Structures are given as C-alpha cells and as structure tokens.
Design a protein with these regions (language model features):
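Conserved acidic
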Residues: 1-183
Length: 183
C-alpha cells in the first residue's frame, strides 16, 4: 500500500508552459539561470527521516495538524467540485496524468482547471500548493502515512556543498567547459 501511494504521488520537477502562452512565439523575453536548485534543496530542506507510519483515513484538520508539526505526509485524497481560485492562474498545479480518477474535468494543456471529482495521491508539499491554488466543496483523505522530517546527514550536506563549489568554480575557467558539462 505505502509503496503504491509513493509511486502514485511521485512527480518530477514542475516544468510547464504558461497556458496563456503555450504554443505562441513571444518576442523580447528575458530569463536567468539558477546555478542549481537541487543542491540548495538537498542542503536546506527537510526530508522524511523515519519509516512512514500508517495513519489511515484522516480529516483535513488532522492533516493540517501533522503539517504544523513538520511531519512528512503521503496520502490518497478525493476532491469534490474542484476549481481554480484564480481563473487567470498561468500554471495550474494538478496534472490530469497524475490523477487516478478525474470526472467531468476542464483540462488545459494537461492541467486540471476544474473537475466534478478527482482522486490522486499527494505529499504534504503537493497538498499545500493545491489548497493554495484550488477550492473544493469537500476533500476526503482516505489513507495517509506520516514520517518525522529532518535534515539529511551533515556529512552528506557538506559533500554536496563541496561538489557544488567545485562545479561553479569550473564554470568560469576557460578550457574547463567539458568538465563543467560533465558535472
């Protein structure tokens, strides 16, 4: 059960085009390069550090309690009459492809704008974003697991910082591009 909910909840980085500009050629735009989000998250964010404990069905109040206590959560949820709070939200969070059921849904570029009903597996991080972006008449948590959160081991975080510094130093050295690209 836990393995399957973890598999269902898994999603990679949230990369998506603004639904208002997808497929359009936009001139005179700017961008910037983040040197790397992954080392930052590995060093500065907390992760589940104990085995997940099965809680079972829970109320939204229970979930919010666990979240306030800094617990890592994974759960199966059902949402009724789901809709975006802001119809102009450029990148809605819920991907239809990650739902186990999605009934009478309005989909734009693969993302759920509204649905009569949907089921999906989510983490506490997903749920925070969903609660911020969407309204629903009812949210039912049919199954939930929790783990204590904490930082990854100090030695590992220090190693990540060391490699990050070495990588960024290569970036500015002429003739080292091949080594930088490998890192």
């Amino acid at each position: 059960d836990l393995y399957m909910v973890l598999r269902d909840a898994f999603r990679g980085g949230d990369t998506h085009a603004s639904r208002f500009y997808a497929g359009a050629v936009v001139e005179n735009v700017e961008s910037y390069d983040r040197s790397s989000s992954y080392p930052d998250v590995i060093v500065n964010c907390q992760y589940p550090i104990t085995p997940f404990y099965h809680v079972g069905a829970a109320s939204l109040k229970d979930v919010k309690y666990y979240m306030q206590k800094g617990r890592a959560l994974v759960m199966r949820i059902a949402m009724y009459n789901v809709r975006l709070r802001d119809k102009y939200s450029p990148v809605p969070y819920i991907p239809k492809a990650k739902t186990q059921s999605c009934v009478n849904a309005e989909i734009d570029n693969g993302r759920v704008l509204a649905a009569e009903y949907l089921e999906m597996a989510v983490t506490d991080i997903d749920l925070k974003i969903i609660l911020d972006q969407y309204d629903a008449d009812n949210i039912v948590i049919s199954d939930m697991w929790q783990s204590r959160s904490g930082y990854l081991p100090r030695a590992y975080r220090e190693l990540v910082k060391k490699y990050y510094v070495q990588k960024t130093e290569l970036k500015v050295v002429d003739g080292m591009e091949a080594y930088y690209d490998k890192s």
